[in-house]
């Protein structure tokens, strides 16, 4: 069994990404990034409150194959494919309002990676 460390795209097809989108975008190309950056202190304050809430707010990322050690990538979801996670959005009203102001936003979350852990190279359908 060989290991595939290349860029992969889908839950079902772990082959190389075949799309035409860039791997990274320049934030300066999007007007809404300035609004998020200008409000980073509010976002950070709400994140700190969630983290102080303990492990019940952090969930292991659902796709264990994307990390070198399971349970090391943790997430707090706000939106996933347009579905709003009210549990977290209600605790972070400023962050939620900022996210909802992003045109075309489908998915958003806070993410944390344990020290000495690795997220494998990938390109998903929302980045």
Where are these predicted regions, by residue range?
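Fe(II)/2-oxoglutarate oxygenase catalytic core
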Residues: 1-123
């Amino acid at each position: 069994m060989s290991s595939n460390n290349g860029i992969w795209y889908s839950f079902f097809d772990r082959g190389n990404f075949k799309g035409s989108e860039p791997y990274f975008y320049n934030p300066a190309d999007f007007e809404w990034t300035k609004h998020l950056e200008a409000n980073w202190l509010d976002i950070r304050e709400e994140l700190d409150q969630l983290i102080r809430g303990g492990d019940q707010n952090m969930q292991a990322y659902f796709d264990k194959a994307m990390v070198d050690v399971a349970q090391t990538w943790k997430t707090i979801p706000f939106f996933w494919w347009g579905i709003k996670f009210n549990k977290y959005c209600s605790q972070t009203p400023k962050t939620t309002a900022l996210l909802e102001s992003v045109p075309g936003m489908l998915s958003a979350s806070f993410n944390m990676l344990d020290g000495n852990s690795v997220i494998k190279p990938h390109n998903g359908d929302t980045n």
